[in-house]
C-alpha cells in the first residue's frame, strides 16, 4: 500500500456512489483487506436504501476475481492504484484520481480515461503521507468533478431497459468498481 497521499477521500467516493445509485447504478468497492475501514466509511455515509446497491468487496476477492468483476463493470473510478491500471488494461472507462503522484509518470494505458488532478504548488510530491497534512491535492478534487469526468466517458443516466443485469449497470472503483488501494 502506498499511503493515504494517493487515496481520494472516502466521503467523496460516498457522494459519487450516492449520486450513481440514485441513477440506477450498483457500486462495487474493491481493494485489499487494508481498505476495509475506508469501505466501511463509504457505506456509513450512504443512506440505508443506497447501501442495498453498494457492495463492499474489499479483502473478499482474489486478484483474478477482481479482474473478472472489473471486466464487466460499466466504468471505474479509482485512485492511482494497481487495480486502476488493471481496469485500464481491460479497456474499461476509467476516472483516475492523482494526488501525490503524477500521470506523467504512471498513466493508465487506455484512451478511455479521464485523469483528474489539481495544480497546486506542493503537487506532485510523491510522498506516501501528505507532508503538509492537508491532502488538498485530493480533497479539492470534488465529487462533482469526478461525475463530470465520468459523464464524458459513459452515459451515467439511469438505464431505461427492464431486466438489465447488475454487471451492465455497475460502476467500478479500488475503492470501485470503486477502487481504494
Functional labels for PLM-detected ranges:
Residues 43, 53-57, 88-158, 162, ...:
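Nucleotide-sugar donor-binding patch of glycosyltransferase catalytic domains
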Residues 1-3:
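Conserved donor-binding/catalytic core segment of Leloir-type glycosyltransferases
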Residues 6, 39, 135:
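Short acidic, gly/pro-rich beta-turn/loop elements at beta-sheet edges
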Residues 7, 66-70, 76, 80, ...:
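Aromatic-residue detector
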Residues 9-99:
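Donor-binding and catalytic core of enzymes assembling or modifying cell-surface/extracellular glycoconjugates
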